[in-house]
Amino acid sequence: MFIAVEGIDGAGKTTLAKSLSSLLEKEGFRVFLTREPTDDIRNYEGDDVELFIKFTLDRYKHQKEIRKKLNEGFVVISDRYIRSSYAYEMKGAAAALGSEEKAKEWMDCVSNIITIRPDINILVQVDVQVGLDRISKRNGTITHFEQRERLNEALKIYNSFDWDIKVDGTDPLDKITNEVYLYLKNKIGL
């Protein structure tokens, strides 16, 4: 099973992914916890079209590792995956290509090389201000990905997707971890 945990910066994705991983391991599952972007590209900067292409290439390489772990019987949990690229690069791609519709069409085409798709997509929801407050407390600096306008745009795109489960990132961690675990248990018989 492949699970992607998505949401804006500061939503609590990493915290939830780690907590869910620990719970599943306690329940006897072998879990591979990963993240995107990988370390190979984490500090790359460029315009949104360049970033989408670079992140897709990074994901193309990453999916090989994911496929291997899935074939070995691991539950794979990814802190971000393909929907994050759409959320964060859509606005710039739309500006470059003339419309959001054209940008989505182009992004879909470029993303066709990504053949490993999550079985379960989880959205951790928080207000942009909550995300910004958490980012400031975490490291004190805001990157260009973490600007209010960019997070608002990302949140808009995230909300346009259908999700298997949405959780409130302001709820206690135990509550949202158990909520996701119960969903997985009921939905797919964990």
Curated annotation (Swiss-Prot):
UniProt superkingdom: Archaea
GO cellular component: cytosol
Catalytic activity: dTMP + ATP = dTDP + ADP
EC number(s) reported in the record: 2.7.4.9
Matches recorded under InterPro entries: P-loop_NTPase (IPR027417), Thymidylate_kin-like_dom (IPR039430), Thymidylate_kinase (IPR018094)
One Pfam family from the record: Thymidylate_kin
GO molecular function: ATP binding; dTMP kinase activity
Enzyme class: transferase
CDD domains for this protein: TMPK
Binding site for ATP: 7-14
Alphabetic keyword roster: ATP-binding, Kinase, Nucleotide biosynthesis, Nucleotide-binding, Transferase
GO-annotated biological processes: dTDP biosynthetic process; dTTP biosynthetic process; dUDP biosynthetic process
NCBIfam families recorded: DTMP_kinase
PANTHER family linked to this entry: THYMIDYLATE KINASE, UMP-CMP KINASE 2, MITOCHONDRIAL
Family in the record: Belongs to the thymidylate kinase family.
Protein name: Probable thymidylate kinase
Organism for this UniProt entry: Thermoplasma volcanium (strain ATCC 51530 / DSM 4299 / JCM 9571 / NBRC 15438 / GSS1)
